[in-house]
């Protein structure tokens, strides 16, 4: 595989260049705005393209090193693309509601994940010995935990990089990542604050096609990184083993005749 490719045409067709109404802008985004049309800000995609490429390179690098990538997008139109993309590349996601302390209080969150697994085990066994009322309560508790923690229950620790759609809605998640020095890749619409975003990507954060494109590209970068990491491990293994074989061959070669002769002398 190779780093996923994308074009200006793809971004335009997805509507990535359409910002918000001009009166809803964040002045800090001024440098990424090309102009306005019908009171709608137009994002300068000539800047978005190299920034998106830079972000994909970083995501690939993290995945190649075996790092965890967390997709975050809890608003309605981002929920499905985020979950689908994360699952496709065997990574993690939060797509319903960000629980405060998800990253900064991981120990407590781990306890909730343990409870979720316990409930899954009980309900998988059909809750033998429990009343219908108890089972209903347990099912509701499980479903509630699954919504918030289902996408991170296998993460095993804090992520190494986080991909975010809508920095305004996910402000708490971004603050937690910053406290822990976790790099943040984020889509920045014209009403967003770019401060504190490690890898900013100016683009529309509402259009369904745009969100799908971003998520697909990030997932493809992860998959490429995973493939590269496996290939590198194979090359390193071969490199460490190969030089030994000729040496062993040279050392063992003189011993072979003696070893073969031993049974003959014993028989004699």
Swiss-Prot record:
Keywords: Ribonucleoprotein, Ribosomal protein. Belongs to the universal ribosomal protein uS2 family. Gene3D superfamilies: Glucose-6-phosphate isomerase like protein, domain 1 (3.40.50.10490), Helix hairpin bin (1.10.287.610). Coiled coil: none annotated. The keyword Nucleus does not apply. Pfam families: Ribosomal_S2. The lineage of its organism: Bacteria, Pseudomonadati, Pseudomonadota, Alphaproteobacteria, Caulobacterales. This is Small ribosomal subunit protein uS2. The gene is rpsB. InterPro entries: Ribosomal_uS2, Ribosomal_uS2_bac/mit/plastid, Ribosomal_uS2_CS, Ribosomal_uS2_flav_dom_sf. GO terms for cellular component: cytosolic small ribosomal subunit. GO terms for biological process: translation. GO terms for molecular function: structural constituent of ribosome. It comes from the Bacteria.
